[in-house]
């Protein structure tokens, strides 16, 4: 059963932040309650701001990130989470190396969505269309992930 879902990227201002915001909206739209979602970055810092491109894209998705503050990943985050979804294989490798006890709940977002292996590439510093492509890719995976979570949670409830 997945009740606490953590998204992780590098800086926690683009990929994981978008995944958090969009998944919260999707969960609400699907009427799925009691699922906590949050995000962190391996190099998260209050000093890093969400890029304007990301703020615009999330506004278009009705998934506001205006008050989002980048935060670093902690051991407490990992122990609290039922499911940890990362954007790059490097993120998974680093987390499992530092916290081997959580290896069984850390997955690449793309792989957990059933879309094969591979990373969700970081668009930071690239063109606006790269941010949009990243957002679209994450949104597609999230739709699959939320369906998977819904099925898993329904089967555990019965």
Segments predicted by a language model, with ranges:
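Phosphate-binding/catalytic loops
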Residues: 83, 89-158
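Helix N-cap/beta->alpha junction signal
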Residues: 16, 88-89
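Conserved active-site segments centered on acidic
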Residues: 1-80, 147-157
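Hydrophobic beta-strand core positions in alpha/beta domains
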Residues: 7, 85-86
């Amino acid at each position: 059963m997945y009740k606490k879902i953590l998204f992780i990227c590098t800086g926690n201002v683009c990929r994981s932040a978008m995944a958090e915001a969009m998944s919260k909206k999707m969960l609400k739209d699907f009427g799925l309650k009691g699922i906590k979602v949050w995000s962190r970055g391996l190099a998260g810092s209050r000093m890093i701001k969400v890029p304007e491109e990301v703020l615009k894209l999330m506004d278009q998705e009705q998934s506001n990130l205006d008050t989002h503050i980048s935060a670093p990943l902690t051991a407490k985050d990992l122990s609290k989470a039922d499911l940890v979804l990362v954007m790059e294989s490097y993120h998974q490798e680093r987390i499992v190396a530092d916290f081997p006890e959580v290896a069984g709940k850390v997955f690449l977002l793309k792989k957990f969505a059933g879309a094969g292996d591979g990373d969700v590439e970081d668009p930071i510093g690239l063109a606006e269309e790269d941010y949009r492509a990243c957002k679209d890719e994450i949104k597609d995976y999230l739709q699959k992930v939320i369906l998977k979570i819904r099925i898993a949670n329904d089967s555990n409830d019965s």
